[in-house]
């Protein structure tokens, strides 16, 4: 079958999760790269633990927390692990920057070309809808994305099969008509 929709992961694929390093370096000199890497690693670890700890639930994980909350918890863990001060003002600056991560420079042109081909475009993300909406708007991509899909309604993170099933619930097409794009190998594998 022909591809009818191109669905992108958000964090790490459309939005550079490591762009937070610049602000982190300003706030914590010499620690920006460590903060960016550890923060992202812990964020992903939390999503996996939550989904894997309750794999047979029919109504999502009882341990589910919105991605924004996990992002904040991951930052707190990271700062504690690196023995850095968790001063509220600095934490809020980092969190606000995370809500407006730098998009990769080629995104807009690529999305415009996909739209010009008549294909449906979407994001499927662990991110909460408000996080995704902020990031998409900040990046100027709201006119080139047809759908922004969050896993929040099912209370399971990617790589649960149910999370990828949200695409067909939102866009009435067959799974083999979807091209899923992610910079994360675990995510691409989960979508297969």
PLM feature spans:
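Alpha-helical elements of Rossmann-like donor-binding domains used by nucleotide-donor carbohydrate transfer enzymes
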Residues: 22-23, 38, 73-77, 93, ...
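Substrate-recognition "cap/lid" segment bordering the active-site pocket of phosphatases
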Residues: 108, 122, 128-179, 189
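Active-site neighborhood of HAD-like aspartate-dependent phosphohydrolases
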Residues: 1-44
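Short, acidic loop-to-helix structural element flanking the phosphoryl-transfer center
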Residues: 64, 68-72, 84-123, 133, ...
């Amino acid at each position: 079958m022909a591809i009818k929709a191109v669905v992108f992961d958000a964090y790490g694929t459309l939005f550079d999760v490591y762009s937070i390093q610049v602000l982190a370096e300003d706030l914590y000199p010499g620690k920006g790269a460590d903060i960016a890497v550890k923060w992202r690693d812990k964020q992903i670890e939390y999503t996996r633990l939550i989904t894997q700890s309750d794999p047979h639930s029919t109504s999502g994980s009882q341990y589910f927390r919105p991605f924004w909350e996990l992002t904040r918890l991951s930052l707190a863990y990271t700062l504690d692990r690196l023995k850095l001060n968790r001063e509220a003002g600095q934490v809020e600056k980092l969190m606000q920057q995370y809500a407006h991560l730098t998009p990769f420079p080629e995104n807009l042109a690529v999305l415009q070309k996909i739209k010009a081909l008549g294909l449906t475009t979407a994001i499927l993300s662990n991110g909460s809808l408000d996080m995704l909406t902020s990031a998409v708007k900040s990046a100027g991509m709201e006119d080139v994305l047809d759908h922004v899909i969050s896993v929040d309604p099912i209370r399971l993170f990617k790589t649960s099969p149910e999370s990828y099933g949200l695409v067909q619930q939102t866009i009435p097409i067959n799974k083999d008509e979807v091209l899923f794009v992610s910079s994360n190998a675990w995510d691409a594998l989960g979508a297969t």
